[in-house]
């Protein structure tokens, strides 16, 4: 990641998170949450395009990059991850509503906050890329096509073997894998092995728990879903028929693959900006008029 940012350390419980901030302090805040096995560095192309209009905030999620890596599986639950987002937002946005963008596991974990009434009025807009809400997934009937694409989830639950794969060359060859499968030239991340090994706890701490007992989770903020149609890990069908949970929302298919944030940063940045800009003024007005009695109501009207 180019040093066009200020680096902060934010404490979330007993975990220190590395946070990278750029753009004017007066600009609308926009938080970017990365997926697996990335760090906040994956957002560099998007940051460069959005920092002229937004106060761009990205952070290494727990276990990745320069952030602390708890050892217990229980420290990687969706509840803890949503707590990290709150800590980052409190430290960087104050009481101002913020726009939120998540990719891959960053998107999955952001859904926990977006569907939490406690965040109502704080999140001005949410753009989800290649990462569904696990509660929505497991309350629907998973199609065979998606089941076949999700082989890696079962693999990451195996003992020993996944770690060996990453240690014995997987981490070193990761940029090559992205070049072959995604046609992107990713810079080598010096903490790739750390990202990969710790990030497997995200799968182990959350998938079985949500599969056993999916919850009813309704969006508390305007939602936009960007859907890469050639995603080899998440099928486009996983983001359809969500009106019950999201109300009105934006869903747009993008001609791209899973790491579309690296392959097509111009397109993704423009879609983020378009949606966030449309929601900025209503979010500020709603935040000013927000009353505690309204918390928990389902959001039914989204531009």
Language-model segments: what does each one mean?
Residues 279-303:
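Alpha/beta-hydrolase-fold serine-hydrolase catalytic core, especially in secreted/extracellular enzymes
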Residues 2-4, 15-17, 38, 42, ...:
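Flexible "cap/lid" subdomain of the alpha/beta-hydrolase fold that forms the substrate-access gate
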Residues 101, 207, 272-283:
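Short, hydrophobic alpha-helical segments
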Residues 85, 89, 268, 272, ...:
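Hydrophobic "lid"/C-terminal helical patch
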């Amino acid at each position: 990641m180019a040093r066009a940012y200020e680096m902060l350390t934010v404490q979330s419980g007993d975990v220190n998170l590395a946070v990278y901030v750029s753009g004017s302090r007066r600009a609308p805040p926009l938080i970017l949450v990365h997926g697996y096995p990335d760090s906040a560095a994956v957002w560099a192309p998007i940051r460069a395009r959005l920092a002229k209009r937004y106060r761009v905030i990205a952070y290494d999620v727990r276990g990745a990059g320069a952030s602390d890596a708890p050892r217990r599986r229980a420290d990687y639950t969706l509840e803890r991850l949503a707590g990290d987002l709150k800590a980052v937002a409190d430290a960087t946005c104050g009481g101002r509503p913020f726009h939120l963008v998540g990719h891959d596991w960053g998107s999955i974990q952001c859904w926990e906050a977006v569907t939490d009434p406690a965040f109502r009025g704080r999140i001005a807009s949410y753009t989800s890329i290649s990462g569904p809400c696990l509660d929505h997934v497991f309350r629907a009937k998973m199609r065979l096509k998606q089941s076949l694409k999700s082989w890696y989830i079962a693999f990451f639950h195996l003992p020993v073997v996944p770690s060996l794969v990453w240690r014995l060359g997987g981490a070193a060859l990761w940029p090559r894998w992205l070049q072959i499968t995604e046609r992107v030239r990713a810079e080598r991340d010096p903490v790739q092995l750390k990202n990969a090994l710790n990030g497997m706890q995200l799968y182990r701490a959350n998938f079985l728990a949500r599969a056993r007992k999916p919850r009813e989770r309704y969006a508390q903020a305007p939602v936009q879903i960007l859907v890469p149609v050639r995603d080899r890990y998440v099928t486009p069908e996983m983001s359809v028929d969500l009106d019950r949970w999201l109300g009105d929302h934006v869903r747009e298919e993008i001609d791209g693959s899973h790491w579309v944030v690296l392959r097509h940063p111009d397109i993704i940045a423009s879609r983020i900006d378009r949606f966030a800009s449309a929601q900025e003024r209503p979010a500020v007005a709603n935040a000013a008029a927000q009353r505690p009695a309204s918390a928990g109501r389902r959001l039914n009207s989204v531009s």
